[in-house]
Amino acid sequence: MFLLIFKGKILSRIKQEGRWVQTLQKKSWFESPYSSGIILFLWNTLMTGVVAFFIFILTKVNIPFLHLVILGIGTIISIWAWSIFNIAWIGSRKNRFKMASIGSSFYAILGVYALYRYLTLKPSYPGEDLFMAALGLMAVLIIAVVALLTCFVFTGFPKKEQLY
């Protein structure tokens, strides 16, 4: 929630003349909302996969709260990338929404999958406690919804100075 409130301040830290922004603007695929949306979708998939991999690795290490650091770093890197997509986009508002919708749809798919798994959760043997599995699936669902909204807002709505 704080990220959405301070979106303008976060976006103001990314410069139009920055290396990453200029690199994206020079790419021919970035001009199309569909191809840039697919790249954003793949970026979100990659970041979620990397964070999930590190959290899986951390289950083997007995260091408490380190998973929160990994989640925080993944969130910061994702918001940084979404901000670069926002600043680098040159095109109509309608095409920006297309790009944001395609790119953030990964989190909608992840949320629907987590909801399906939660609703169809059954014990594998009689007496199995499913509390932790249900809690994990609810956490994935909440994270997916928050990431969906944050990604869409950061990539789909320009800074006020960018409106034309």
Task: Give the label of every model feature segment.
Residues 105-125:
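Hydrophobic alpha-helical transmembrane segments in multi-pass integral membrane proteins
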Residues 64-86, 106-112, 141-146:
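Generic alpha-helical transmembrane segments
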Residues 12-62:
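N-terminal signal-anchor transmembrane alpha-helix
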Residues 1-19, 79-86, 151-156:
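Membrane-water interface of transmembrane alpha-helices
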Residues 25-42, 46, 72-76, 98-111:
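Transmembrane alpha-helical segments of multi-pass membrane proteins
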Residues 97, 125-142:
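Membrane-interface segments at the starts/ends of alpha-helical transmembrane spans
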Residues 1, 108, 136-153:
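Alpha-helical membrane-embedded segments
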